[in-house]
């Protein structure tokens, strides 16, 4: 695992965008694994800027997203379908047929999990998997558990995740309690994993994921076993890692 120190959120975002843009330039038909949440927004903004300048072309890129809320319509402004279009897809020349996300409106968990796993197999190896990390160390919506989940599954969100998501909804009752998530095994098969983290609220998760024991109680810790994992974190997110760096 390689750790890259960033000055702040803007610097973190630019460093992550540099790695993704290099991948797309070197391999125009790259498969990009994409994440949602506040952490990668700046990365998407930078990629869009470079596209608008003519420096990047996404026409042959395929994308697969990590997760989607269970029972949430794509047009809901808090869905991850909406998020991705709002922050990235609608601003670049990506082919809509190459965009892949879980279908949160499929009530049959086994059916949707099997469908999305089949999609992931069909697109081939993910070249770069972009990840944020939750305060409790979750990646995707793989929450702390007694074992690592292998494939796509529907997960019950923990109270800490629900608490962190409250700010996006008008009331607590609207905050989703469940979500479809790509499994740990699938994330680990990506050729390169790129984690972005910013802020003191991510400091514990970064320390435990990078330097703690590998345990499903801290899902991000599995990335220590990946042969090409990069963590880009700002000073605040690295504030508890002083003894290790």
Please give the residue ranges for each predicted region.
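Glycine-rich N-terminal segment of FAD-binding domains in flavoprotein oxidoreductases
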Residues: 26-52
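Ligand-binding beta-strand-loop-alpha-helix segment within the catalytic cores
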Residues: 56-129
């Amino acid at each position: 695992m390689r750790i890259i120190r960033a000055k702040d959120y803007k610097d973190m975002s630019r460093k992550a965008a540099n790695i993704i843009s290099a991948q797309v330039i070197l391999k125009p038909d790259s498969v990009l694994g994409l994440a949602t949440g506040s952490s990668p927004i700046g990365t998407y903004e930078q990629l869009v800027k470079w596209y608008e300048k003519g420096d990047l072309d996404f026409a042959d890129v395929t994308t697969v997203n990590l997760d989607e809320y269970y029972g949430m319509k794509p047009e809901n402004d808090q869905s991850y379908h909406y998020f991705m279009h709002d922050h990235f897809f609608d601003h670049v020349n990506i082919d809509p047929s190459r965009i892949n996300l879980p279908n949160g409106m499929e009530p049959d968990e086994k059916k949707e999990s099997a469908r999305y796993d089949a999609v992931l197999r069909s697109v081939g190896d993910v070249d770069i998997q972009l990840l944020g990390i939750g305060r409790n160390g979750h990646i995707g919506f793989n929450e702390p558990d007694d074992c690592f989940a292998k494939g796509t599954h529907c997960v019950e969100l923990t109270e800490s995740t629900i608490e962190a998501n409250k700010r996006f909804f008008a009331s607590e009752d609207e905050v989703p309690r469940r979500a479809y998530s790509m499994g740990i095994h699938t994330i680990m098969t990506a050729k390169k994993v790129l984690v972005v983290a910013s802020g003191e609220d991510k400091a514990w998760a970064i320390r435990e994921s990078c330097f703690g024991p590998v345990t499903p109680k801290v899902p991000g810790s599995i990335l220590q076993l990946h042969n090409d994992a990069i963590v880009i974190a700002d000073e605040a997110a690295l504030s508890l890692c002083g003894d290790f760096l």
